[in-house]
Design a protein with these regions (language model features):
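Extracellular "spike/adhesin" assembly and maturation modules
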Residues: 1-49
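Collagenous Gly-X-Y triple-helix signature in extracellular proteins
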Residues: 53-306
Length: 306
């Protein structure tokens, strides 16, 4: 059987001669139409490739939201990321994993692709591994405090969340993701002045007053990463490297809202910004607010894979 091959340089043809009852039912009549469809398909595919290149910038601009769980393995997804092409991966695409921790037992985590190469070349040591930022669709199922008492002493790095809670989830996620979580360097708050005025607003006292470069595996999000701007962050020390909004929340702002546990009812979750001497920032039902550090909030961090 002979094959029909698309033209080397096809043109888009938007008109086709209709077959009628009197048209001879000869293979030539069918072949010419098949040829036109084949040429059009090749032309449109070439135009798509020309416009949407396989690069971080292009893929950060397209929201798709496809379930990749049964399409690619974690290793296959990370191969596409580490190659820097991000082929067939777009913002909003997701896959499910299962983790087990001493904090919450067994649970499902839906990992959403939130952006590509967002931290490329950042850090006191340049981060030059191609990566995808992952944000869980929902909080982990167990609530947590930032600190056992209503203080922000030591900033984010001094918190119970940073020192005790997140390392437990980091270990479980690293196991579930076949060690594909990438460490990168970020500026994190390490001190709080309890007497000065906070940028959060009139009458709010206490602000982040220092920072240090730290290795990061799993980390709470900043206000800018979620909202695109600061809302209640106490000072510029709260921003550091977290100074752009994740493409996920730019393209699908409804995903700021999360549930408690996989597909659970909506719940507020902690952000990393110090707000005052007693409170940290959090994301409520899409709005920015703050809560005393000993409040029980959701844990919805991000991490990079590749």
């Amino acid at each position: 059987m002979a094959n029909i091959t698309a033209a080397e340089h096809p043109k888009l043809v938007l008109e086709m001669t209709a077959m009628e009852r009197t048209t001879p039912a000869h293979y030539d009549e069918w072949n010419v139409r098949h040829q036109q469809l084949l040429d059009n398909d090749k032309y449109l595919n070439e135009q798509f490739i020309n416009v949407f290149s396989d690069s971080a910038a292009a893929h950060n601009s397209i929201y798709r939201g496809k379930n990749l769980t049964n399409v690619y393995t974690v290793d296959e997804i990370c191969q596409r990321i580490s190659a820097g092409t991000f082929k067939d991966l777009y913002v909003g695409d997701y896959f499910d994993i299962s983790i087990t921790t001493d904090l919450g037992g067994a649970e499902t985590v839906r990992c959403i692709l939130a952006g590509f190469d967002v931290f490329w070349n950042n850090g006191d040591t340049a981060f030059t591994k191609h990566h995808a930022v992952i944000v869980p669709k929902d909080c982990f199922k167990t609530k947590s405090v930032m600190n056992d008492t209503n203080v922000t002493t030591g900033g984010y790095v001094g918190s119970k969340m940073y020192k005790t809670v997140l390392p437990v989830y980091a270990a479980a996620l690293q196991t579930a993701l076949n060690n594909h979580i990438l460490s990168h360097r970020e500026l994190l708050t390490t001190a709080v002045s309890t007497t000065g005025n906070s940028n959060a607003g009139a009458g709010i006292t206490g602000y982040a007053s220092n920072w240090e470069w730290k290795d990061c595996l799993v980390k709470l999000m900043s206000e800018i990463q979620v909202y695109g701007s600061t809302v209640l962050s106490s000072s510029f020390y709260d921003t550091g490297c977290d100074n752009i909004q994740f493409p996920l929340f730019r393209l699908a702002p409804n995903l700021k809202v999360a549930g408690l546990g996989h597909n659970g009812s909506r719940w507020w979750y902690w952000l990393l910004a110090v707000v005052s001497a007693a409170a940290f920032a959090f994301c409520h039902h899409g709005d920015g607010s703050h809560r005393d550090a000993a409040g029980d909030g959701g844990v919805r961090p991000y991490f990079c894979i590749g």
